[in-house]
Amino acid sequence: MVLGPEQKMSDDSVSGDHGESASLGNINPAYSNPSLSQSPGDSEEYFATYFNEKISIPEEEYSCFSFRKLWAFTGPGFLMSIAYLDPGNIESDLQSGAVAGFKLLWILLLATLVGLLLQRLAARLGVVTGLHLAEVCHRQYPKVPRVILWLMVELAIIGSDMQEVIGSAIAINLLSVGRIPLWGGVLITIADTFVFLFLDKYGLRKLEAFFGFLITIMALTFGYEYVTVKPSQSQVLKGMFVPSCSGCRTPQIEQAVGIVGAVIMPHNMYLHSALVKSRQVNRNNKQEVREANKYFFIESCIALFVSFIINVFVVSVFAEAFFGKTNEQVVEVCTNTSSPHAGLFPKDNSTLAVDIYKGGVVLGCYFGPAALYIWAVGILAAGQSSTMTGTYSGQFVMEGFLNLKWSRFARVVLTRSIAIIPTLLVAVFQDVEHLTGMNDFLNVLQSLQLPFALIPILTFTSLRPVMSDFANGLGWRIAGGILVLIICSINMYFVVVYVRDLGHVALYVVAAVVSVAYLGFVFYLGWQCLIALGMSFLDCGHTCHLGLTAQPELYLLNTMDADSLVSR
C-alpha cells in the first residue's frame, strides 16, 4: 500500500527503518512540493562535520557570471578532485605510460569527463535537497539494503585509505634514503593525519586553502618531472585526442580498464554531495539553487582540469622515458650512476614493470637524485591530501547511513586502525614489492564498490519528488544509465581478469560464491534505479509484496516533514 501525504507513519518509518521490506520508502511531501521546501540553514544545524562554518555568497545584481561568486563557491570541487590524484591514480598513471606509452591518454581524458558528469549529479543532489547522498540513502532504502550499502561504501573508503597509507609510507622511505623503514612510514602516517585534521579548527577557508597548497605541490613536483623528461608534445596531443590503441594487447587493455577504475572513485560521490552544503544557499529560491549548481559545476570543471593535467604529467613522463625499456637497460643505467637501488630490478630482458617506489628509483637513475626526491614529495602530498578527504568521506558516510555522530578523532582511530593493521603487517614481514602490489588488489576493490555509489546517485537525481524541477531530464537519464552500465561492466571485466590470474581453485570457489551475492545486490539497486528512470513496468506491485507503486515518481521518500529530521 502506498501512503498518501496525509497519512502518518510509525516512528520506525520516520527514522528510515523499514524492517525487512525490499522496497524503497514512500514519498515525502516536502519533496513533492514544486517549491523547494527547506529554508536556508534549517535542518542542518546538527551537522558537526565540516559545517561549523558556512560560507556566505555575495549579493550582486543579476549577471550571467561573477568572479566574486565563483570564488565564494570555490573549495568543494578542489577537495573532491583530490580523489583523482591519490596514490592509486598516480600508480595507474605511471603504469599506463610504461606499458602503453601515450596511447591511453584519451582513455584518461574520457574517464575524467565521465567523472565530471557524475560529480555534477552528486553536487546537484546536495545543493537541491540539502542532504548528502548517504543521508538520502538512509531515508529511502529499507534497513537491510541500507546496511549492506553502508558496509560496501565503508569497504571502499578503507581500501582507499590503505592506498594512501602505502603511498605516504613509500614517499617517506624514499625521502629518508631508506633510513626510515616502510613500517616506520606507516606509523608516521597515523600521527600526521591527526595533526592535519585539526586544521579545520582554524576555519573552513583556511582548510580549503591548505588543500589547494597540496594540489599546488603536486602540480609543481610532477610538472618538474615533465619539464625534465621533455616528452614529445605531438605524441602527448595525439594520445590525448586520437582514440586508438594500435598494437595494444591484453596488458594494455587491462591497463585501460584500470585507468577507469582508478579515476572514478565510489566514495567521492558521497563526499562531493556533502561538501557543497558548506555554502549558504536559500533552497526556497530556485534562482539561487540554479546559480549554485552553475558555479559548483564551473568549479568542478576547473578542479578536474587541473587534476587531469597533473595525471597527464605522470603518464607522459613514464611514456617518454620508460616505455619499451627492459630491466637490463635500467640496471645498467642505475649501476653507472652508482644508485644503491640497482639490485631492485632483475637482470633480464623482460619489459620494465614499475610502481610508485620503482618509479621514483628509475627517475633518480636516469635524471638524478633531485628527480627522485621531488617525485617522493609529490607522492607524499598526494597521500596526505587523500588521507584527509578520505576521513571526511568516512565521517559523512557513517553519519548519513547510521544516523550516528562520531567525533573525527574516533572516526580516524577506527578507519585508520583497520587500514593500518594489514598494511603494517605487510610492511614488517614482506618487502616493498608486496606492499606496492597491494595497490592492484585495492584497485580491484574500488572497482567492485563503484555500483554502490553510481546507481544510488543516478536513482535519486532522476526522481522529481527528490529533485523537484532539478531532476534529470530524459536525455540525462538515458545518458546516465548508459554510462553507469558501461562503467560497471568495464570494472567487472577488470575484476574477472584479476580473479582469473589468481590461479587457485579454492579462490575461484570463494570468488564464485561472493559474486552471486554481489550481483544479486547490484541487481536489486539496478532494478530500483530503472523504476526511478521511468520503467514502471518493472514494478510488480502487490504481487510481489514489495510495496512499490506503479507511479515511479511517487514511490520514494518517507512521509515525514523535512524540517523534523532525526536529531543526532
From Swiss-Prot:
Q: One GO CC annotation, please?
A: membrane
Cytoplasmic face: residue ranges? Answer: 1-69, 118-154, 201-208, 277-301, 382-408, 462-482, 528-568
Q: How does this protein sit in the membrane?
A: Multi-pass membrane protein
Q: How is it modified after translation?
A: Ubiquitinated by WWP2. N-glycosylated.
Compositional bias per record (Polar residues), positions renumbered to this chain: 23-40
Question: GO molecular-function annotation terms?
Answer: cadmium ion binding; cadmium ion transmembrane transporter activity; cobalt ion transmembrane transporter activity; copper ion transmembrane transporter activity; ferrous iron transmembrane transporter activity; inorganic cation transmembrane transporter activity; iron ion transmembrane transporter activity; lead ion transmembrane transporter activity
- Report which superkingdom the organism of origin falls in: Eukaryota
Localisation per UniProt entry: Mitochondrion outer membrane; Golgi apparatus, trans-Golgi network membrane; Recycling endosome membrane
Extracellular face residues = 91-96, 176-179, 230-255, 323-360, 430-440, 504-506
Phosphoserine modifications at? 564, 567
What are the alphabetically sorted keywords of the record? Cell membrane, Disease variant, Endosome, Glycoprotein, Golgi apparatus, Ion transport, Iron, Iron transport, Lysosome, Membrane, Mitochondrion, Mitochondrion outer membrane, Phosphoprotein, Symport, Transmembrane, Transmembrane helix, Transport, Ubl conjugation
Q: Which InterPro entries match?
A: NRAMP_fam
Region spans: Required for early endosome targeting: 555-559
> Which PANTHER family does this UniProt record tie to the protein?
NATURAL RESISTANCE-ASSOCIATED MACROPHAGE PROTEIN 2, SOLUTE CARRIER PROTEIN FAMILY 11 MEMBER
| Functional summary from the UniProt entry | Proton-coupled metal ion symporter operating with a proton to metal ion stoichiometry of 1:1. Selectively transports various divalent metal cations, in decreasing affinity: Cd(2+) > Fe(2+) > Co(2+), Mn(2+) >> Zn(2+), Ni(2+), VO(2+). Essential for maintenance of iron homeostasis by modulating intestinal absorption of dietary Fe(2+) and TF-associated endosomal Fe(2+) transport in erythroid precursors and other cells. Enables Fe(2+) and Mn(2+) ion entry into mitochondria, and is thus expected to promote mitochondrial heme synthesis, iron-sulfur cluster biogenesis and antioxidant defense.
Something else the entry says is: NRAMP2-mediated iron uptake is markedly stimulated by nifedipine in a concentration-dependent manner.
State the protein's name. Answer: Natural resistance-associated macrophage protein 2
What organism does this protein naturally occur in?
Homo sapiens
